[in-house]
Amino acid sequence: MVGDMDAQQQELQQILNPQKLKSLQEWMQRNSITLTQVNGQRKYGGPPPGWQGPAPGSGCEVFISQIPNDVYEDRLIPLFQSIGTIYEFRLMMNFSGQTRGFAYAKYGDPLTASAAVTTLHQYRLPEGGCLTVRRSTEKRQLRLGDLPVSMNESKLLMVLQMLSDGVEDVLLKPPGPKGKEVVALVNYTSHYAASMAKKVLVEAFRNRYGISITVRWTSFSKSKRVEDTPQEDSCVTPLVLKPLSKPSLLHYDVPAHQSLLPLFRAVGGPTTSEQRDEMIPQPTIMSRNELIPQSSIRQRDEMVPQLPIRPRDGMAPQSPISLDAVSHLQWMCEVNRLGSPQYEVHFHHAAPDGFLYFAFKVLIPGLPLPLYGFVQILPGTSARAMKSEVYRAAAEQVIQTLCRVSNLRPF
């Protein structure tokens, strides 16, 4: 018996990487992170400490798959927090303590979730393999079958609220042709609440009321897709961006400016030039029809003003008074030894009000990840003029981002 237990323990240690588990525990202690394991998934946040405002609505969650079995939250959460504040992160686990290879990250708004899909889909991990990042379907409705004919909506709603959390409403369908089965559609406040209810309702009805019911996800299409199992891509065929040649770094043998180290740490990136060179990701895939709320795009109106330029570290900019945004960003990158920004722009759509919307990608060699965003402009007198305007607006957004997530200042 003892020999069998030792063999099982050795087998478990072979499955679980002790060094990776130690790194996870150290990361949790260092950052005061609390992870809660509930019914096959380990959860962070929902809400996280310091969260202000209501819980995010639909469209704010992304589905992450192709996660290696020994990659845990200490690698994944900082990576996805590099896009924006995470409201909730759920990593699916099996009984051995391994991950099941997929997780969910929920952001505060759909725009940030869209940026996560655009930026981190096909992101290559140092451990090997590429992450797959998609929009989560966020199913919230369960179908309860084989209910007794005497059941009514108000009674069922009261019972469900006692047995599960997050019940919003219940729609009871009349008995079928044989008059023996009643079906109910139950809406929950979140996919997590519905998923937890799905795990407990069958047994709860059997133990408390002696009733054997069926519980499954409501099918909205012919193809069955269950969200607590790895899901396939439901998006349209993506548009593959033209690959960029690997850029060379300016001052390659000199580390980046110290004020950028918080940015590298925030995104889980390296803090030396040699490591950053190894971490430059391949161009990602962008969907043609990713919808961005116009209210979010209009936030571009609050752009960084043209500010007087002040030399730093003994290096003087080309213009001692002021620069346009493109030149300004170029100057910031040169001063902080990040390399020259490279722009990639694609037309997105034309709005009824006449504005043209463009998606941009700015690759700065000294940063571990490209920067993505959307801009809107009015039609110009020439293609060259419009291109210059798009570059200017993109540069302004990038300057804002650099100033927000690091100690850099635009002057």
From Swiss-Prot:
GO terms for molecular function: mRNA 3'-UTR binding; mRNA binding; RNA binding. It comes from the Eukaryota. Keywords: Cytoplasm, Developmental protein, Nucleus, RNA-binding. This is Dead end protein 1. Gene3D superfamilies: 3.30.70.330. GO terms for cellular component: cytoplasm; germ cell nucleus; nucleus; P granule. It comes from Danio rerio. CDD domains: DSRM_DND1. Residues 60-138 form the RRM domain. The lineage of its organism: Eukaryota, Metazoa, Chordata, Craniata, Vertebrata. RNA-binding factor that positively regulates gene expression by prohibiting miRNA-mediated gene suppression. Relieves miRNA repression in germline cells. Prohibits the function of several miRNAs by blocking the accessibility of target mRNAs. Sequence-specific RNA-binding factor that binds to U-rich regions (URRs) in the 3'untranslated region (3'-UTR) of several mRNAs. Does not bind to miRNAs. Germline-specific protein required for the primordial germ cell (PGC) survival and migration during early embryonic development. Pfam families: DND1_DSRM (PF14709), RRM_1 (PF00076). The gene is dnd.
